């Protein structure tokens, strides 16, 4: 129950700081879409882990990305799971696992989440020049502190 309340209040705080702003970009991930991913990650945690899933979206260049990790009091945050956001490719899927950690998690435990996909399977490789993983990871570095 504590984890659920923490996730709820983190979501409310996120909404008040980002998604509920007046100058919202219509191409950006919505609060609901981001929350759906956060809940999917939260469901993977053991009952008494004391951890919560945390996701943040950012625009890097011409694309939006979502980075998620697990957080808990007194421990360093987990590695980042990075997803590419696209609402045109598929009528349901919105976030596509982009980095190795996200692809492994998707293939192993999140394959049946309707909002999620795998970038490699959906768009193919190599990544286009407009996606610079170094820049993307740098933008989300704040989540690792």
Predicted regions mapped to residue ranges:
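Mature extracytoplasmic domains of secretory-pathway proteins
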Residues: 44-104
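Positively charged n-region of N-terminal signal peptides that target proteins for export
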Residues: 1-4
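Bacterial signal peptide processing site
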Residues: 21-23
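C-terminal motif of bacterial Sec signal peptides marking the signal peptidase cleavage site
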Residues: 15-19
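C-terminal partner/receptor-binding element of secreted or periplasmic proteins
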Residues: 103-145
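Hydrophobic helical h-region of N-terminal Sec-dependent signal peptides
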Residues: 6-14
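N-proximal, solvent-exposed amphipathic alpha-helical segments enriched in charged/polar residues
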Residues: 30-50
């Amino acid at each position: 129950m504590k984890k659920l309340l923490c996730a709820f209040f983190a979501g409310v705080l996120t909404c008040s700081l980002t998604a509920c702003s007046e100058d919202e970009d219509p191409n950006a991930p919505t609060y609901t879409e981001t929350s759906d991913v956060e809940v999917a990650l939260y469901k993977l945690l053991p009952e008494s882990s004391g951890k919560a899933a945390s996701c943040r979206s950012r625009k890097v260049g011409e694309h939006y990305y979502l980075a998620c990790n697990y957080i808990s009091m007194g421990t360093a945050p987990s590695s980042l799971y990075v997803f590419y956001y696209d609402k045109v490719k598929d009528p349901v899927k919105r976030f596509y696992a982009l980095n190795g950690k996200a692809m492994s998690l998707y293939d192993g435990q999140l394959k049946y989440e309707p909002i999620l996909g795998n970038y490699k399977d959906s768009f193919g490789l190599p990544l286009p020049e407009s996606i610079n993983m170094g820049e993307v990871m740098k933008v989300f570095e704040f989540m690792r502190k």
